[in-house]
Protein backbone atom coordinates (compact mmCIF):
# COMPACT_ATOMS: atom_id res chain seq x y z
CA UNK A 1 0.00 0.00 0.00
CA UNK A 2 1.41 3.40 -0.98
CA UNK A 3 2.21 5.73 1.88
CA UNK A 4 0.90 9.33 1.74
CA UNK A 5 3.51 11.84 0.63
CA UNK A 6 4.87 14.55 2.94
CA UNK A 7 2.53 17.27 1.62
CA UNK A 8 -0.56 15.18 2.35
CA UNK A 9 0.67 14.47 5.87
CA UNK A 10 1.29 18.17 6.52
CA UNK A 11 -2.13 19.08 5.15
CA UNK A 12 -3.79 16.46 7.35
CA UNK A 13 -1.95 17.74 10.44
CA UNK A 14 -2.90 21.34 9.57
CA UNK A 15 -6.58 20.41 9.24
CA UNK A 16 -6.52 18.68 12.63
CA UNK A 17 -4.86 21.73 14.21
CA UNK A 18 -7.43 24.05 12.61
CA UNK A 19 -10.29 21.87 13.86
CA UNK A 20 -8.89 21.94 17.40
CA UNK A 21 -8.43 25.71 17.20
CA UNK A 22 -12.01 26.24 16.06
CA UNK A 23 -13.26 23.94 18.80
CA UNK A 24 -11.38 25.97 21.39
CA UNK A 25 -12.86 29.30 20.37
CA UNK A 26 -16.44 28.19 19.80
CA UNK A 27 -18.70 30.67 21.59
CA UNK A 28 -22.36 30.20 22.39
CA UNK A 29 -23.86 33.66 22.13
CA UNK A 30 -27.34 34.25 23.49
CA UNK A 31 -29.95 36.95 23.02
CA UNK A 32 -29.87 40.05 25.25
CA UNK A 33 -33.16 38.99 26.86
CA UNK A 34 -31.78 35.56 27.76
CA UNK A 35 -28.55 37.02 29.12
CA UNK A 36 -30.33 39.63 31.22
CA UNK A 37 -32.88 37.17 32.61
CA UNK A 38 -30.46 36.42 35.45
CA UNK A 39 -31.06 39.93 36.86
CA UNK A 40 -33.76 39.88 39.52
CA UNK A 41 -35.51 42.52 41.66
CA UNK A 42 -33.55 43.98 44.59
CA UNK A 43 -30.16 43.02 43.14
CA UNK A 44 -27.05 45.16 42.70
CA UNK A 45 -25.70 45.29 39.13
CA UNK A 46 -22.29 46.62 38.11
CA UNK A 47 -22.08 48.40 34.74
CA UNK A 48 -18.77 48.69 32.88
CA UNK A 49 -17.86 52.33 32.19
CA UNK A 50 -16.05 54.92 30.06
CA UNK A 51 -15.34 53.77 26.48
CA UNK A 52 -16.71 50.33 27.36
CA UNK A 53 -20.14 51.44 28.63
CA UNK A 54 -22.30 48.53 27.33
CA UNK A 55 -24.98 50.65 25.69
CA UNK A 56 -26.39 47.78 23.62
CA UNK A 57 -27.19 45.72 26.73
CA UNK A 58 -28.41 48.77 28.65
CA UNK A 59 -30.93 49.45 25.90
CA UNK A 60 -32.25 45.92 26.31
CA UNK A 61 -32.12 46.15 30.11
CA UNK A 62 -34.57 49.05 29.88
CA UNK A 63 -36.95 46.67 28.08
CA UNK A 64 -36.79 44.36 31.12
CA UNK A 65 -38.03 47.10 33.45
CA UNK A 66 -41.56 45.66 33.55
CA UNK A 67 -40.35 42.69 35.63
CA UNK A 68 -37.74 44.47 37.77
CA UNK A 69 -37.99 46.64 40.87
CA UNK A 70 -35.35 48.28 43.01
CA UNK A 71 -32.35 47.15 40.97
CA UNK A 72 -29.32 49.13 42.12
CA UNK A 73 -26.91 50.14 39.35
CA UNK A 74 -23.28 50.69 40.39
CA UNK A 75 -20.74 52.25 38.02
CA UNK A 76 -18.13 54.95 37.66
CA UNK A 77 -17.81 57.14 34.59
CA UNK A 78 -20.46 55.93 32.15
CA UNK A 79 -20.91 57.39 28.67
CA UNK A 80 -23.71 57.66 26.15
CA UNK A 81 -27.42 57.03 26.58
CA UNK A 82 -27.92 54.76 29.58
CA UNK A 83 -31.61 54.17 28.73
CA UNK A 84 -32.34 53.12 32.35
CA UNK A 85 -31.74 56.52 33.97
CA UNK A 86 -35.09 58.04 32.97
CA UNK A 87 -37.57 59.25 35.63
CA UNK A 88 -40.13 56.69 34.46
CA UNK A 89 -37.75 53.93 35.61
CA UNK A 90 -37.19 55.34 39.11
CA UNK A 91 -38.96 52.39 40.75
CA UNK A 92 -37.20 49.85 38.56
CA UNK A 93 -33.58 51.01 38.53
CA UNK A 94 -31.68 53.18 40.97
CA UNK A 95 -28.24 54.46 39.97
CA UNK A 96 -25.81 54.56 42.88
CA UNK A 97 -22.75 55.93 41.13
CA UNK A 98 -19.15 56.04 42.32
CA UNK A 99 -18.46 59.02 40.03
CA UNK A 100 -20.72 61.52 38.27
CA UNK A 101 -20.26 61.74 34.51
CA UNK A 102 -22.28 63.91 32.15
CA UNK A 103 -24.58 60.98 31.37
CA UNK A 104 -25.98 60.83 34.91
CA UNK A 105 -25.35 64.37 36.17
CA UNK A 106 -28.95 65.43 35.71
CA UNK A 107 -30.26 62.28 37.37
CA UNK A 108 -28.04 62.76 40.43
CA UNK A 109 -28.93 66.42 40.85
CA UNK A 110 -32.62 65.78 40.23
CA UNK A 111 -32.77 63.29 43.06
CA UNK A 112 -33.46 60.04 41.19
CA UNK A 113 -29.84 58.84 41.29
CA UNK A 114 -27.21 58.90 44.04
CA UNK A 115 -23.47 59.47 44.32
CA UNK A 116 -20.97 57.74 46.63
CA UNK A 117 -17.88 59.88 47.44
CA UNK A 118 -14.91 57.50 47.43
CA UNK A 119 -11.29 57.42 46.27
CA UNK A 120 -10.94 55.36 43.09
CA UNK A 121 -8.19 53.32 44.70
CA UNK A 122 -10.59 52.15 47.42
CA UNK A 123 -13.58 51.14 45.28
CA UNK A 124 -12.46 47.51 44.89
CA UNK A 125 -12.49 47.20 48.68
CA UNK A 126 -16.18 48.14 48.70
CA UNK A 127 -16.77 45.07 46.53
CA UNK A 128 -14.36 42.74 48.35
CA UNK A 129 -15.59 43.63 51.84
CA UNK A 130 -19.25 43.22 50.81
CA UNK A 131 -20.02 46.85 51.56
CA UNK A 132 -21.30 46.98 47.98
CA UNK A 133 -21.52 43.28 47.04
CA UNK A 134 -22.13 42.76 43.32
CA UNK A 135 -24.83 40.31 42.25
CA UNK A 136 -24.37 40.76 38.50
CA UNK A 137 -21.57 42.41 36.52
CA UNK A 138 -22.16 43.55 32.93
CA UNK A 139 -18.90 44.08 31.05
CA UNK A 140 -17.98 44.97 27.48
CA UNK A 141 -15.10 42.87 26.16
CA UNK A 142 -13.18 41.79 23.08
CA UNK A 143 -13.94 38.41 21.49
CA UNK A 144 -12.07 35.39 22.89
CA UNK A 145 -8.59 34.74 21.51
CA UNK A 146 -7.30 31.29 20.47
CA UNK A 147 -7.07 30.33 24.14
CA UNK A 148 -10.52 31.62 25.08
CA UNK A 149 -9.43 34.86 26.77
CA UNK A 150 -11.40 38.08 26.35
CA UNK A 151 -10.07 41.52 27.26
CA UNK A 152 -11.59 44.36 29.28
CA UNK A 153 -9.83 46.57 26.75
CA UNK A 154 -9.19 50.20 27.64
CA UNK A 155 -11.33 50.11 30.79
CA UNK A 156 -9.80 47.76 33.36
CA UNK A 157 -10.20 50.27 36.24
CA UNK A 158 -12.76 48.86 38.73
CA UNK A 159 -14.20 46.36 36.24
CA UNK A 160 -11.59 43.74 37.10
CA UNK A 161 -12.59 43.79 40.76
CA UNK A 162 -16.28 43.72 39.88
CA UNK A 163 -15.74 40.61 37.76
CA UNK A 164 -13.69 38.98 40.51
CA UNK A 165 -16.42 39.44 43.11
CA UNK A 166 -19.70 39.24 41.15
CA UNK A 167 -21.95 36.18 41.47
CA UNK A 168 -22.92 36.36 37.78
CA UNK A 169 -21.09 37.92 34.84
CA UNK A 170 -22.68 38.98 31.56
CA UNK A 171 -20.37 39.93 28.68
CA UNK A 172 -21.19 42.18 25.75
CA UNK A 173 -18.68 40.83 23.21
CA UNK A 174 -17.56 43.23 20.51
CA UNK A 175 -14.92 42.86 17.77
CA UNK A 176 -14.41 46.65 17.96
CA UNK A 177 -13.18 46.36 21.55
CA UNK A 178 -9.37 46.49 21.73
CA UNK A 179 -7.25 43.89 23.48
CA UNK A 180 -4.86 45.28 26.07
CA UNK A 181 -1.95 43.90 28.03
CA UNK A 182 -2.11 43.80 31.81
CA UNK A 183 -4.89 42.82 34.21
CA UNK A 184 -7.81 42.86 31.79
CA UNK A 185 -7.80 39.27 30.51
CA UNK A 186 -10.80 37.12 31.49
CA UNK A 187 -11.38 33.59 30.26
CA UNK A 188 -14.69 33.23 28.45
CA UNK A 189 -15.59 30.30 30.71
CA UNK A 190 -16.03 32.85 33.53
CA UNK A 191 -19.00 34.43 31.76
CA UNK A 192 -22.46 33.10 32.51
CA UNK A 193 -23.79 34.64 29.29
CA UNK A 194 -22.25 36.28 26.23
CA UNK A 195 -24.06 38.63 23.85
CA UNK A 196 -22.57 39.67 20.52
CA UNK A 197 -22.66 43.24 19.18
CA UNK A 198 -20.63 45.43 16.85
CA UNK A 199 -21.15 48.88 18.38
CA UNK A 200 -18.42 51.50 18.25
CA UNK A 201 -16.76 52.25 21.55
CA UNK A 202 -17.60 55.57 23.18
CA UNK A 203 -15.21 58.39 22.32
CA UNK A 204 -14.32 61.82 23.71
CA UNK A 205 -12.43 64.79 22.31
CA UNK A 206 -10.52 66.88 24.84
CA UNK A 207 -8.27 68.68 22.36
CA UNK A 208 -11.11 70.69 20.82
CA UNK A 209 -11.55 72.50 24.14
CA UNK A 210 -7.96 73.77 24.24
CA UNK A 211 -7.44 77.49 23.65
CA UNK A 212 -4.72 80.11 24.24
CA UNK A 213 -5.55 80.27 27.95
CA UNK A 214 -5.22 76.55 28.53
CA UNK A 215 -2.02 76.43 26.49
CA UNK A 216 -0.53 79.11 28.76
CA UNK A 217 -1.41 76.96 31.74
CA UNK A 218 0.09 73.97 29.96
CA UNK A 219 3.30 75.90 29.45
CA UNK A 220 3.61 76.81 33.13
CA UNK A 221 2.96 73.21 34.17
CA UNK A 222 5.48 71.92 31.63
CA UNK A 223 8.03 74.22 33.25
CA UNK A 224 7.61 72.25 36.49
CA UNK A 225 8.34 68.94 34.74
CA UNK A 226 11.95 67.85 34.38
CA UNK A 227 13.35 65.27 31.99
CA UNK A 228 12.93 61.69 33.24
CA UNK A 229 9.85 62.55 35.30
CA UNK A 230 6.86 60.22 35.45
CA UNK A 231 3.55 61.99 34.87
CA UNK A 232 -0.12 61.50 35.69
CA UNK A 233 -2.80 63.47 33.88
CA UNK A 234 -6.41 63.96 34.83
CA UNK A 235 -9.28 64.33 32.37
CA UNK A 236 -9.91 67.46 30.35
CA UNK A 237 -8.50 70.24 28.23
CA UNK A 238 -5.76 71.36 30.64
CA UNK A 239 -4.01 67.99 31.03
CA UNK A 240 -4.17 67.65 27.25
CA UNK A 241 -2.70 71.16 26.87
CA UNK A 242 0.16 70.15 29.18
CA UNK A 243 1.00 67.26 26.87
CA UNK A 244 1.16 69.69 23.94
CA UNK A 245 3.84 71.64 25.81
CA UNK A 246 6.19 68.70 26.43
CA UNK A 247 7.85 68.42 23.03
CA UNK A 248 11.20 69.74 24.30
CA UNK A 249 11.32 67.20 27.12
CA UNK A 250 13.17 63.89 27.14
CA UNK A 251 12.63 60.41 28.52
CA UNK A 252 9.31 60.92 30.28
CA UNK A 253 7.30 58.12 31.84
CA UNK A 254 3.59 57.67 32.41
CA UNK A 255 1.81 56.17 35.42
CA UNK A 256 -1.76 57.45 35.35
CA UNK A 257 -5.32 56.40 36.10
CA UNK A 258 -6.35 57.42 32.58
CA UNK A 259 -4.77 58.43 29.28
CA UNK A 260 -6.03 60.09 26.13
CA UNK A 261 -4.94 61.02 22.61
CA UNK A 262 -2.32 63.54 23.69
CA UNK A 263 0.18 60.83 24.56
CA UNK A 264 0.28 59.18 21.11
CA UNK A 265 2.54 61.69 19.38
CA UNK A 266 4.82 61.94 22.42
CA UNK A 267 5.24 58.16 22.40
CA UNK A 268 5.87 58.15 18.66
CA UNK A 269 8.56 60.84 19.07
CA UNK A 270 10.19 58.88 21.93
CA UNK A 271 9.55 61.74 24.38
CA UNK A 272 7.46 59.32 26.42
CA UNK A 273 9.47 56.12 26.54
CA UNK A 274 9.23 55.11 30.22
CA UNK A 275 12.95 54.25 30.31
CA UNK A 276 13.65 55.71 33.72
CA UNK A 277 10.59 54.67 35.68
CA UNK A 278 11.37 52.85 38.91
CA UNK A 279 8.46 50.44 38.46
CA UNK A 280 7.13 49.10 35.16
CA UNK A 281 9.99 50.54 33.09
CA UNK A 282 9.31 50.71 29.34
CA UNK A 283 5.55 50.54 29.98
CA UNK A 284 2.90 53.25 29.92
CA UNK A 285 0.78 52.25 32.91
CA UNK A 286 -2.88 53.24 33.03
CA UNK A 287 -6.17 51.92 34.32
CA UNK A 288 -8.40 53.21 31.55
CA UNK A 289 -8.26 55.28 28.38
CA UNK A 290 -10.79 57.64 26.87
CA UNK A 291 -10.37 59.43 23.57
CA UNK A 292 -10.68 58.75 19.85
CA UNK A 293 -10.89 55.55 17.84
CA UNK A 294 -7.32 56.30 16.78
CA UNK A 295 -6.27 56.05 20.42
CA UNK A 296 -8.03 52.71 20.89
CA UNK A 297 -6.49 51.34 17.69
CA UNK A 298 -3.05 52.50 18.84
CA UNK A 299 -3.42 50.78 22.20
CA UNK A 300 -4.85 47.57 20.72
CA UNK A 301 -2.44 44.68 21.43
CA UNK A 302 0.35 47.20 22.07
CA UNK A 303 2.81 45.72 24.59
CA UNK A 304 4.11 49.22 25.41
CA UNK A 305 0.87 49.78 27.39
CA UNK A 306 -0.18 48.01 30.59
CA UNK A 307 -3.76 48.44 31.81
CA UNK A 308 -3.88 47.46 35.46
CA UNK A 309 -6.34 47.28 38.37
CA UNK A 310 -7.33 50.65 39.83
CA UNK A 311 -6.45 49.57 43.37
CA UNK A 312 -2.88 49.07 42.17
CA UNK A 313 -2.48 51.97 39.74
CA UNK A 314 -4.00 54.50 42.15
CA UNK A 315 -2.41 53.19 45.34
CA UNK A 316 -0.32 56.09 46.74
CA UNK A 317 2.24 53.57 48.01
CA UNK A 318 2.71 52.33 44.43
CA UNK A 319 2.63 55.83 42.92
CA UNK A 320 5.39 57.09 45.24
CA UNK A 321 7.76 54.33 44.07
CA UNK A 322 8.33 56.25 40.84
CA UNK A 323 10.81 59.03 41.60
CA UNK A 324 10.00 62.50 40.26
CA UNK A 325 6.30 61.67 40.06
CA UNK A 326 4.24 64.58 38.70
CA UNK A 327 0.48 64.60 39.35
CA UNK A 328 -1.48 67.07 37.19
CA UNK A 329 -5.12 67.64 38.12
CA UNK A 330 -7.73 70.36 37.78
CA UNK A 331 -10.46 71.85 39.95
CA UNK A 332 -13.73 73.77 39.99
CA UNK A 333 -12.50 76.40 42.46
CA UNK A 334 -9.87 77.02 45.15
CA UNK A 335 -10.23 79.19 48.22
CA UNK A 336 -7.47 81.56 49.37
CA UNK A 337 -6.16 79.03 51.90
CA UNK A 338 -5.71 76.32 49.25
CA UNK A 339 -8.80 74.16 49.76
CA UNK A 340 -9.59 72.51 46.43
CA UNK A 341 -13.12 71.76 45.26
CA UNK A 342 -13.00 69.45 42.24
CA UNK A 343 -16.30 67.60 42.26
CA UNK A 344 -19.11 70.11 42.79
CA UNK A 345 -20.35 73.63 42.13
CA UNK A 346 -21.75 74.45 45.53
CA UNK A 347 -24.23 71.66 46.21
CA UNK A 348 -24.53 70.79 42.51
CA UNK A 349 -22.70 67.51 41.99
CA UNK A 350 -20.62 67.93 38.85
CA UNK A 351 -18.20 64.98 38.92
CA UNK A 352 -16.64 63.00 41.74
CA UNK A 353 -13.69 62.52 44.06
CA UNK A 354 -12.08 60.21 41.51
CA UNK A 355 -8.36 59.60 41.78
CA UNK A 356 -7.17 63.15 42.41
CA UNK A 357 -6.18 62.59 46.04
CA UNK A 358 -4.64 59.20 45.25
CA UNK A 359 -2.14 60.88 42.94
CA UNK A 360 -1.77 64.17 44.80
CA UNK A 361 -0.64 62.24 47.86
CA UNK A 362 1.45 59.73 45.92
CA UNK A 363 3.31 62.46 44.05
CA UNK A 364 3.85 64.48 47.23
CA UNK A 365 5.69 61.63 48.93
CA UNK A 366 7.58 60.53 45.81
CA UNK A 367 11.27 61.46 45.81
CA UNK A 368 11.38 64.69 43.79
CA UNK A 369 7.65 64.50 43.09
CA UNK A 370 5.28 67.42 42.53
CA UNK A 371 1.49 67.46 43.01
CA UNK A 372 -0.04 70.17 40.80
CA UNK A 373 -3.52 71.71 40.59
CA UNK A 374 -3.97 73.56 37.29
CA UNK A 375 -7.01 75.75 36.60
CA UNK A 376 -8.02 78.79 34.55
CA UNK A 377 -8.37 81.87 36.76
CA UNK A 378 -11.99 82.26 35.63
CA UNK A 379 -14.75 80.14 34.17
CA UNK A 380 -15.89 80.57 30.57
CA UNK A 381 -18.64 82.87 31.96
CA UNK A 382 -16.14 85.07 33.78
CA UNK A 383 -16.68 83.72 37.30
CA UNK A 384 -13.60 83.70 39.53
CA UNK A 385 -12.13 80.30 40.38
CA UNK A 386 -9.81 81.60 43.11
CA UNK A 387 -12.24 82.74 45.80
CA UNK A 388 -12.27 83.93 49.44
CA UNK A 389 -14.33 80.91 50.48
CA UNK A 390 -15.73 77.94 48.62
CA UNK A 391 -19.41 78.04 47.69
CA UNK A 392 -21.74 76.78 50.45
CA UNK A 393 -22.07 73.02 50.18
CA UNK A 394 -18.98 72.59 47.98
CA UNK A 395 -16.96 69.45 48.57
CA UNK A 396 -13.26 69.63 49.46
CA UNK A 397 -11.54 66.94 47.41
CA UNK A 398 -7.92 67.96 48.06
CA UNK A 399 -7.29 69.49 51.47
CA UNK A 400 -5.11 72.58 51.84
CA UNK A 401 -2.52 70.46 53.65
CA UNK A 402 -2.08 68.37 50.48
CA UNK A 403 -1.75 71.25 48.02
CA UNK A 404 1.76 72.11 46.81
CA UNK A 405 1.55 73.82 43.40
CA UNK A 406 -1.36 75.79 41.93
CA UNK A 407 -1.10 76.98 38.33
CA UNK A 408 -3.23 79.41 36.32
CA UNK A 409 -2.57 81.27 33.08
CA UNK A 410 -0.96 83.98 35.26
CA UNK A 411 1.72 81.83 36.82
CA UNK A 412 2.60 79.35 39.56
CA UNK A 413 1.86 79.58 43.30
CA UNK A 414 3.79 77.28 45.65
CA UNK A 415 1.77 76.77 48.84
CA UNK A 416 3.40 73.93 50.72
CA UNK A 417 4.86 75.09 54.03
CA UNK A 418 3.24 78.52 53.80
CA UNK A 419 0.93 79.96 56.44
CA UNK A 420 -2.59 81.10 55.60
CA UNK A 421 -1.61 84.72 54.88
CA UNK A 422 1.28 83.64 52.67
CA UNK A 423 -0.95 81.23 50.80
CA UNK A 424 -3.53 83.94 50.20
CA UNK A 425 -0.88 86.31 48.81
CA UNK A 426 0.52 83.60 46.53
CA UNK A 427 -2.91 82.68 45.18
CA UNK A 428 -3.95 86.30 44.64
CA UNK A 429 -0.82 86.78 42.53
CA UNK A 430 -2.08 84.18 40.02
CA UNK A 431 -5.77 85.15 40.18
CA UNK A 432 -7.39 87.07 37.34
CA UNK A 433 -6.22 90.73 37.57
CA UNK A 434 -9.81 91.97 37.78
CA UNK A 435 -10.44 89.74 40.83
CA UNK A 436 -7.38 90.69 42.86
CA UNK A 437 -8.70 93.84 44.52
CA UNK A 438 -11.76 92.04 45.89
CA UNK A 439 -9.57 89.16 47.07
CA UNK A 440 -7.22 91.61 48.80
CA UNK A 441 -10.18 93.15 50.62
CA UNK A 442 -11.47 89.74 51.71
CA UNK A 443 -8.04 88.76 52.98
CA UNK A 444 -7.70 91.98 55.00
CA UNK A 445 -11.10 91.37 56.59
CA UNK A 446 -10.14 87.80 57.42
CA UNK A 447 -6.52 88.16 58.52
CA UNK A 448 -6.66 91.79 59.78
CA UNK A 449 -3.07 92.50 58.78
CA UNK A 450 -2.31 91.70 55.15
Could you say what each language-model-derived stretch is?
Residues 6-9:
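Short hydrophobic alpha-helical segments enriched in small aliphatic residues
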Residues 16-450:
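Conserved alpha/beta enzyme-core scaffold
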Amino acid sequence: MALPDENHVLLFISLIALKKKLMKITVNYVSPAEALSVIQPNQRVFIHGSAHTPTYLLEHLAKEAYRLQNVEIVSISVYGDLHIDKPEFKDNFHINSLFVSASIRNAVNSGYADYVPVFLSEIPELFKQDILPIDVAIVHVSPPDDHGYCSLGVSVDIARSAVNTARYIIAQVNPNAPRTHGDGLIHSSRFHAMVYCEDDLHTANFTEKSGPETLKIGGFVAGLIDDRCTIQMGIGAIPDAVLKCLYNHKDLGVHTEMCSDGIIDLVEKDIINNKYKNIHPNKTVSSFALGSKQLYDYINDNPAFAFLDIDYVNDPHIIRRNNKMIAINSAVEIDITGQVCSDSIGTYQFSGVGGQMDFMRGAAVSEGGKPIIAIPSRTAKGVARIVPTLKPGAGVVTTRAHVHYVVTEYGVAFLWGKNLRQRAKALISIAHPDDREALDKSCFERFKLF
